[in-house]
Amino acid sequence: MIAAQAKLVYQLNKYYTERCQARKAAIAKTIREVCKVVSDVLKEVEVQEPRFISSLSEIDARYEGLEVISPTEFEVVLYLNQMGVFNFVDDGSLPGCAVLKLSDGRKRSMSLWVEFITASGYLSARKIRSRFQTLVAQAVDKCSYRDVVKMIADTSEVKLRIRERYVVQITPAFKCTGIWPRSAAQWPMPHIPWPGPNRVAEVKAEGFNLLSKECYSLTGKQSSAESDAWVLQFGEAENRLLMGGCRNKCLSVLKTLRDRHLELPGQPLNNYHMKTLLLYECEKHPRETDWDESCLGDRLNGILLQLISCLQCRRCPHYFLPNLDLFQGKPHSALESAAKQTWRLAREILTNPKSLDKL
């Protein structure tokens, strides 16, 4: 048993060195290329409208606010200033979303974003995004990379296609620190010892982002309340939780396996599903010794089995917002074929670790 475990860990480490590191290097190269173009577009936006200041900056060889969706798809979060005159209202009526309401006694004119406030006093995510989209469209025509960058039409999101190969979504957002959403109040679970109180305090201080992007209800049609609402995002908090042990190595292997074998019609699975299931695995195995390098095979196996279970149940709850289902709106047939493909992959890795050489 221990010999089989050791063999799997050896093969996974080899896979990490050969496949995952190559993936990381290729993505890092793409990011540099993509960020040059995006920075140029945002610089042009800022000239037209100084309220949209580019926050895309490189710190320690990684870009602040950039999320890798897949090797050819990225999201850049553009942090906006001055949320101060608004209250954060999170009543759970729209899973995964919240609204920003003008504080009592505050005049509209005190806000930097006065023309985007609705009659009922909400700061509209949709109105801000619509204005930003117009500015980006103009900037794309003027910027020095105009030959290689195009706006993607037929969406209310701000999406650029670069060199016909890459897609970058630019999302206006507010950073919320020092508060924690009511819809995430059940975290951390009282009976689960992970993460410890110090890490919990760090994560809550880190806060979350409010993004201006489409949030669909079950019908797929947006109500006006939804289009004014902001989407909650916990990227930095999640990254902080995954520090230590073999957690990030495990995530890297999962992402590489997804990119190579689970990129399926209907796009049932993305890297965020992998990250979410890794966080649940951390709760199931709360001790740091469970995340020793020697346990990499067990942890990976546990996550793949959990993924199959979620795909079969057609439900994958968000880690911080359990009322939000990350499979919502995905075609059932796509989830079914992903479950079968994940099962084949898990069986292959477990019964024949050497197969990782070919995966």
Curated annotation (Swiss-Prot):
**GO biological process assignments:** camera-type eye development; cell population proliferation; embryonic body morphogenesis; eye development; nervous system development; positive regulation of cell population proliferation
Domain of life here?
Eukaryota
The membrane spanning regions, by residue number, are none
Keyword Electron transport among UniProt keywords: no
Q: What is the effect of changing R51H?
A: In MCSKS; complete loss of ssRNA-binding activity with the variant protein; shows a higher stability than wild-type in tetracycline-inducible cells
Q: Which UniProt keywords apply?
A: Cytoplasm, Developmental protein, Disease variant, Microphthalmia, Nucleus
Localization per Swiss-Prot or TrEMBL: Nucleus; Cytoplasm
Q: Which GO terms describe its cellular component?
A: cytoplasm; nucleus
Q: Chief subcellular site?
A: nucleus
Q: Which PANTHER family match?
A: CELL FATE DETERMINING PROTEIN MAB21-RELATED, PROTEIN MAB-21-LIKE 2
Disease / disorder: Microphthalmia/coloboma and skeletal dysplasia syndrome: A disease characterized by bilateral colobomatous microphthalmia or bilateral anophthalmia, associated with skeletal dysplasia in some cases. Additional ocular findings include microcornea, cataracts, corectopia and nystagmus. Intellectual disability is present in some patients.
Provide the function of this protein. Answer: Required for several aspects of embryonic development including normal development of the eye.
What is stated as this protein's family in its record? Belongs to the mab-21 family.
Q: What is this protein called?
A: Protein mab-21-like 2
The organism of origin for this protein = Homo sapiens
